[in-house]
From Swiss-Prot:
One of its GO terms (biological process) is DNA recombination. HAMAP family: RecA. Belongs to the RecA family. ATP binds at G79, P80, E81, S82, S83, G84, K85, T86. Its main location: cytoplasm. It is found in: Cytoplasm. SMART domains: AAA. The keyword Metal-binding does not apply. This is Protein RecA.
Length: 384
């Protein structure tokens, strides 16, 4: 007879031998029928921390709380037209490829610009692209890619463009009430388990619609029914704000726009946080710009007047020059980025970080002990 563990003894004491034996028999039968791990005690799971992949934006990683998009979950990105939804998704594609993963893009809108994707860092030669003829076909392709377990990220652009086959075959003007909602509901039921099992990140881009006759409250809604809202672990609301003017010869031109990304739903961290990013036309999210702003706000980059400094060395007069310096020095960019992530608890401390902290603490202890020795000497002299 196997030796009882402390946990087993506690369960036996609480529930009794007969009930525990019945439970063990049931668990063995379930494991036999459905495989190992079909049912387990939550504390026995080897991996309890949610794995994440960076979104490609430092500000968004901080807003998400966990440091990026959770693996094995469904993400919805929605917002008005030209707000930057596809740009945010393409940065996730580029980040996936940067980390050695495989990404797929289901282009239901038939509007993906390869040149723009390449400018954002996407390796278009390695990107899997599908332009389906119908919504069912697009979701089936996404399902097969996810089931393979070889794809790390699947992006569907967009839910509104996933037109059911019956609507395509019908005439314009025919009523097709609830067809798309039923299609999405069925797809979510089929895909959610496979997404979790394969640890694939599924990003669904969605558009906005307005409800008719709404006098009070928010009239905005997203097409495709409510299933995606329920199954999504993270929902991002992307809104373009003010235009960004250029400098020098381009001072009268709009070169980008400030964009607000609000985390309206988050199952892995506290929701309702906001990220403010600069989306530059033709370039995507300004990663150097957000790093300069965030690092200077928390004191990693020092700012005195118009000058920005790091580790006592001036890196530029004005934010534009500071951004250019970081773009020209990727090793400094990576070092500051790591320190910011450590500050917000998005990554674990490296050995170098721990050593630096330990050295500071040791110095403080030595200084304190010297002061104590001096105080004791003074006391002895007074007593003498």
């Amino acid at each position: 007879m196997a030796k009882k563990t402390k946990k087993t003894e506690e369960i036996t004491k609480k529930f009794g031998d007969e009930r525990l034996k019945a439970l063990d028999d049931a668990l063995k039968n379930i494991e036999k029928d459905f495989g190992k791990g079909a049912v387990m005690r939550l504390g026995e799971r080897a991996e309890q921390k949610v794995q994440v992949m960076s979104s490609g934006s430092l500000a968004l990683d901080i807003a998400l709380g966990a440091g990026g998009y959770p693996k094995g979950r469904i993400i919805e990105i929605y917002g008005p037209e030209s707000s930057g939804k596809t740009t945010v998704a393409l940065h996730a594609v580029a980040q996936t490829q940067k980390e050695g993963g495989i990404a797929a893009f289901i282009d239901a809108e038939h509007a993906l610009d390869p040149a723009y994707a390449a400018a954002l860092g996407v390796n278009i030669d390695e990107l899997l692209l599908s332009q389906p003829d119908s919504g069912e076909q697009g979701l089936e392709i996404a399902g097969k890619l996810i089931d393979s377990g070889a794809v790390d990220l699947v992006v569907v652009d967009s839910v509104a463009a996933l037109v059911p086959r019956a609507e395509i075959d019908g005439d314009i003007g025919d009523s097709h009430v609830g067809l798309q909602a039923r299609m999405m509901s069925q797809a979510m039921r089929k895909l959610s388990a496979s997404i979790n099992k394969t640890k694939t990140i599924a990003i669904f881009i969605n558009q906005l619609r307005e409800k008719v006759g709404i006098m009070f409250g928010n009239p905005e809604t997203t097409p495709g029914g409510r299933a995606l809202k329920f199954y999504a672990s993270v929902r991002l609301d992307v809104r373009g704000n003010t235009q960004i003017k250029g400098t020098g010869d381009k001072k009268d031109q709009n070169v980008g726009k400030e964009t607000k990304i609000k985390v309206v739903k988050n199952k892995v961290a506290p929701p309702f946080k906001e990220a403010f990013v600069e989306i530059m036309y033709g370039e995507g999210i300004s990663q150097t710009g957000e790093l300069v702003k965030i690092a200077s706000d928390i004191g990693i980059i020092q700012k005195a007047g118009a000058w920005f400094s790091y580790n006592g060395e001036k890196i530029g007069q004005g934010s534009e020059n500071a951004k250019k310096y970081l773009a020209d020095h990727p090793e400094i960019f990576a070092e500051i980025d790591h320190k910011v992530r450590v500050h917000y608890g998005l990554v674990e401390l490296d050995e170098d970080d721990v050593v630096e902290d330990t050295q500071v603490e040791d110095t403080q202890v030595e200084d304190t002990s010297d002061e104590l020795i001096l105080d004791l000497d003074s006391t002895i002299e007074i007593e003498e």
